[in-house]
Amino acid sequence: MMGHRPVLVLSQNTKRESGRKVQSGNINAAKTIADIIRTCLGPKSMMKMLLDPMGGIVMTNDGNAILREIQVQHPAAKSMIEISRTQDEEVGGGTTSVIILAGEMLSVAEHFLEQQMHPTVVISAYRKALDDMISTLKKISIPVDINDSDMMLNIINSSITTKAISRWSSLACNIALDAVKTVQFEENGRKEIDIKKYAKVEKIPGGIIEDSCVLRGVMINKDVTHPRMRRYIKNPRIVLLDSSLEYKKGESQTDIEITREEDFTRILQMEEEYIQQLCEDIIQLKPDVVITEKGISDLAQHYLMRANITAIRRVRKTDNNRIARACGARIVSRPEELREDDVGTGAGLLEIKKIGDEYFTFITECKDPKACTILLRGASKEILSEVERNLQDAMQVCRNVLLDPQLVPGGGASEMAVAHALTEKSKAMTGVEQWPYRAVAQALEVIPRTLIQNCGASTIRLLTSLRAKHTQENCETWGVNGETGTLVDVKELGIWEPLAVKLQTYKTAVETAVLLLRIDDIVSGHKKKGDDQSRQGGAPDAGQE
């Protein structure tokens, strides 16, 4: 028989936690993350100021932006941060609510785990609750007419009121709606709204926010390559290239042996002829503007300038795609294959302006632009990046409504309605599952509660009366007025949220809670500093452990 030596299965420098300790650790981590962000919900939300590792400052109240900047160690906290990113990419809104909800779902589950209830029971109750939440949401949702621009502006406005941009809300709403309507693109009955690719936000410090606008076209941060080229062209013919107008060196390395000096001049001549040929291929089509993603040599500039063609070089690929969508040009890879229908004639004006101390090329007044640039002006970089984030959210909200025109009441009203429906359903349930199921209803109330807290009103009194209100008939739209902290019918205030955002918020929050409840063991391998040295001479060592 072996002595009582402990058997080491895991190597010594790994840390292992298991059982209840892990679950409460995960729940606490999730609660901590939720607490950081709790004050960022609603119109009376606070801003957070973060220093990034480079020493720059980020000022924001956008849930996702805050969590992106925070460095966390706990694995559960990392997955919480991940869900806000998913939410942001998927629907663009609800990044703050999803974290608060997930944190609350876990926090109500802690009580059951302490009573030795098995996590699986809690999980199956949560899953049931999620299905009922989704069906209740769909019941209280109302359809919306996407051509009614007042209604659309109202929806975007309720997403913007919680942001820093709320002072210029009508301007921001119009910008967002305009931009999204521009990039909307229907093909064989399939709607495509790609904000990321085709609605670019360009920030130029200086001026005031009221100067911001949506351009019917594209703006790029470039100047002409030669000072004597035209800087103002009406109805330009635009050619887009993604090849360079320079002498092309071969792919493989080549050596040339020169015996006579005429050969040397001949080689130079060949280079010139090649470039001249390239330029002639382009000049044949009589374009006014040539825009390329690569370089343009001095000689090519000279030929183009003599033909009175404006050239712009080293444009980003994404910008080039946008110009193509805006003016109807095709991007060509080989100048010798240029055809008449590759030329873009959809733009009404090309002009190059100097703003501040940089030159910008504007391609505007497009006939039917399918891409646009949003020009933002403002006092400082920090303000501009916050406004940009807010605008992105507004555009996402607008996109969601256009793709799925269903709305649910905002201001905590839909949470209360769903919570009420769940509480009613749980009365008919028997067995252990009814308690966690009812707890989900309780967890949902965190949204209206936080809204009340952020206004500084009395939470208990208002929540009780809101609960009472929801037990009455036809009161599904009663919620909290985030400005004053009083109870209102949000239908009259016009606070609506897209159904898609709410559904995603609930799904993500419950899924995350379920995911973290499933974990009962964390093994973290720590790398010791001396680890690398012991690797080389560490073979005999390993046998002794």
UniProtKB/Swiss-Prot annotation:
Provide the protein name. T-complex protein 1 subunit gamma
Q: Please indicate if the UniProt record lists Cytoplasm as a keyword.
A: yes
Q: Which PANTHER family match?
A: CHAPERONIN (PTHR11353)
Q: Which residues bind ATP?
A: 42, 94-96, 411, 482, 497
Question: What's this chain's function?
Answer: Component of the chaperonin-containing T-complex (TRiC), a molecular chaperone complex that assists the folding of actin, tubulin and other proteins upon ATP hydrolysis. The TRiC complex mediates the folding of WRAP53/TCAB1, thereby regulating telomere maintenance. As part of the TRiC complex may play a role in the assembly of BBSome, a complex involved in ciliogenesis regulating transports vesicles to the cilia.
Q: Which residues carry this modification: N6-acetyllysine?
A: 222
By sequence similarity, the record places it as follows: Belongs to the TCP-1 chaperonin family.
